[in-house]
A protein has these predicted regions:
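Short solvent-exposed loop/turn micro-motifs enriched in small/polar/acidic residues
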Residues: 22-24, 53
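Short intrinsically disordered terminal tails
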Residues: 1-8, 104-108
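Short coil-to-beta transition motif at edge beta-strands of beta-rich domains
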Residues: 3-22
Length: 108
């Protein structure tokens, strides 16, 4: 298991279990804050496109491994902290985040 440090402002993919109908490619988003043992991850909702935040463990897995850890999730109950891979082919460009953030700031 690779143990790399997260960078604030960098895009990653969070892999969840259960996936709630989302693909195993993970949810693309950006780390907005680092806590002692976790990071705050911001992502766009697939329903409506508004920004949401989740707090996940500071655990980065190599992108080559992709989605894994379902058995561990079931055993530990930590279904929302399976792992995070670096987003190398992110579908939402950073400008999309800026656009949504701008709308939130202006109250739209």
């Amino acid at each position: 298991m690779e143990n790399k440090e997260f960078e604030v402002g960098k895009f990653y993919r969070v892999h969840l279990y259960p996936t709630y109908g989302m693909s195993d490619k993970g949810i693309p988003g950006m780390v907005v804050r680092k806590l002692k043992k976790k990071v705050v991850f911001e992502y766009l909702s697939c329903f409506g496109g508004e920004l949401h935040k989740m707090t996940v463990e500071r655990r980065l897995i190599p992108a080559s491994e992709g989605f894994h850890g379902v058995e561990e999730a079931v055993a530990t109950g930590k279904w929302n902290s399976i792992g995070i891979t670096e987003a190398t082919d992110i579908c939402d460009k950073p400008s999309r985040w800026d656009l949504v953030r701008g709308n939130e700031a202006s109250g739209n």
